[in-house]
UniProtKB/Swiss-Prot annotation:
GO terms for molecular function: chlorophyll binding; electron transporter, transferring electrons within the cyclic electron transport pathway of photosynthesis activity. This is Photosystem II CP47 reaction center protein. The keyword Transmembrane applies. Pfam families: PSII (PF00421). SUPFAM superfamilies: Photosystem II antenna protein-like. The gene is psbB. NCBIfam families: PS_II_CP47 (TIGR03039). It is found in: Plastid, Chloroplast thylakoid membrane. Coiled coil: none annotated.
Length: 508
């Protein structure tokens, strides 16, 4: 049977054994890729600096997902949290990656077995001797089993009852660690940034799945509903499954891009909205003001700012700054961060403090403008010097650093002042090593950006797939061109293989 490439799945339409085989093989490919990719990432990952060179700066994609589920130790003798380790055992990065590869091999073997031994008695209707699947019953079984898994994850793994817990951190991504989480049963459980909601929602959704699964196992669908939704047609299963997948993909694209307790910034990097809203800048300013209120000097107050917090307040870590089609990790763009130079404070010749206007997310170039506390422009780097009124030279701008490597150092040379004013557009100023990786200086996105783009794109494609297959199964008789006035009863859909001569016909 010569089929075009876009119709090859016809061969498993009415062949339950081989339908199972191709799905097991798909699972083998997914698990094999996950395990292999994890081992590759472990081979290239440098765990030496979790503050300035975390996994998301290095372009790790699998490791953040493993870490958020409670894995933190490596057979290489390091821990993602920097704690000393003794014997990580199977519950480690390499152990879990290896388990996925072993599982992939077992799935490959079982897929091969089911492909060869496709004609099993279990797939035949004993009354007719023909292939038949009780799809509502199968739906009930799968719903029950997925409910058990969902409940078990929330009640045992996340809570630490039998498992490690999950990654939990503070709102500014400074104190993250693996810890058990108690379910949040109140209104706070609906806050996407409350980890307790992960436990409670998995428990609740799991119980709902178990109850719904038992319902579908014990209650048969009404005949009109069965026929109206084509519940006997395997393409109905395909359509509704695609719907579940695209819905989930849209949800996780949102929780990743906008941030949530499931996507901590220590593992996936900050969100673009944290730059847009000056989230870290406000927290840094709050801490500095608190230090000044304790009678600390400006230098001492800035020296207490964690380097990790300052690093988040840098536009190069904004996932929306990297183009979607610029391949590579963030480190391949602006380089590997080496150290925080400190916070620059600019002043004019009268001693008034000036603030560099920060670059908005969607600008590649932006005028360097310095404003006073009222927002009035006082200095800039002009495009045309002949017409300038506010140039650094004319206004007499100087810069002094507080905290960081240049703490207490000041500059009045206009060329140096302009250099740091340009860099202050991008947030806190860091020394970046572009030589080691031959970084090209062009910003890259973080795994947060890749994940969102991939899942939003495939969700859209799967949405159209759901519409396509749903329409095919609901309106199969119309699409097949069967005359509605036909007086011969055709049992259409019992055998759907192309050219099948055994479809029953019966004159009414």
């Amino acid at each position: 049977m010569g089929l075009p490439w876009y119709r090859v799945h016809t061969v498993v339409l009415n062949d339950p054994g081989r339908l199972i085989a191709v799905h097991i093989m798909h699972t083998a490919l997914v698990a094999g890729w996950a395990g292999s990719m994890a081992l590759y990432e472990l081979a290239v990952f440098d765990p030496s600096d979790s503050v300035l060179d975390p996994m998301w700066r290095q372009g790790m994609f699998i490791l953040p997902f493993m870490t958020r589920l409670g894995i933190k130790e490596s057979w290489g003798g390091w821990s993602i949290t920097g704690e000393p380790i003794a014997n990580p055992g199977l519950w480690s990065y390499e152990g879990v990656a290896g388990a996925h590869i072993v599982f992939s091999g077992l799935c490959f073997l079982s897929a091969t077995w089911h492909w060869v031994y496709w004609d099993l008695e279990i797939f035949s209707d004993p009354r007719t001797g023909k292939p038949s699947l009780d799809l509502p019953k199968i739906f009930g079984i799968h719903l029950f089993l997925s409910g058990v898994a969902c409940f078990g994850f929330g009640a045992f793994h996340v809570t630490g009852l039998y498992g490690p817990g999950i990654w939990v951190s503070d709102p500014f991504g400074l104190t993250g660690k693996i810890q058990p989480v108690s379910p949040a049963w109140g209104a706070e459980g609906f806050d996407p940034f409350v980890p307790g909601g992960i436990a409670s929602h998995h428990v609740a959704a799991g119980l709902l799945g178990i109850i719904a699964g038992l319902f579908h196992l014990s209650v048969r669908p009404p005949q009109r509903l069965y026929r109206g939704l084509r519940m006997g047609n395997i393409e109905t299963v395909l359509s509704s499954s695609i719907a579940a997948v695209f819905f989930a993909a849209f949800i996780v694209a949102g929780t990743m891009w906008y941030g949530s307790a499931t996507t901590p910034i220590e593992l996936f990097g900050p969100t673009r909205y944290q730059w847009d809203q000056g989230y870290f800048q406000q927290e840094i300013d709050r801490r500095v003001q608190a230090g000044l209120a304790e009678n600390l000097s400006l230098s001492e107050a800035w020296s207490r700012i964690p380097e990790k917090l300052a690093f988040y307040d840098y536009i190069g870590n904004n996932p929306a700054k990297g183009g979607l089609f610029r391949a590579g990790a963030m480190d391949n763009g602006d380089g590997i961060a080496v150290g925080w130079l400190g916070h620059p404070i600019f002043k004019d010749k009268e001693g008034n403090e000036l603030f560099v206007r920060r670059m908005p997310t969607f600008f590649e170039t932006f005028p360097v403008v310095l404003v006073d506390k009222e927002g009035v422009i006082k200095a800039d780097i002009p495009f045309r010097r002949a017409e300038s009124k506010y140039s650094v030279e004319q206004v007499g701008v100087t810069v002094e650093f507080y905290g960081g490597e240049l703490n207490g150092v000041s500059f009045s040379d206009p060329a140096i002042v302009k250099k740091y004013a340009r860099r202050a557009q991008l947030g806190e100023i860091f020394e970046l090593d572009r030589a080691t990786l031959k970084s090209d200086g062009v910003f890259r996105s973080s795994p947060r950006g890749w994940f969102t783009f991939g899942h939003a794109t495939f969700a859209l494609l799967f949405f159209f797939g759901h519409i396509w297959h749903g329409a095919r199964t609901l309106f199969r008789d119309i699409f097949a061109g069967i005359d509605p006035e036909l007086d011969i009863q055709v049992e259409f859909g019992a055998f759907q293989k192309i050219g099948d001569p055994t479809t029953k016909r019966q004159v009414v």
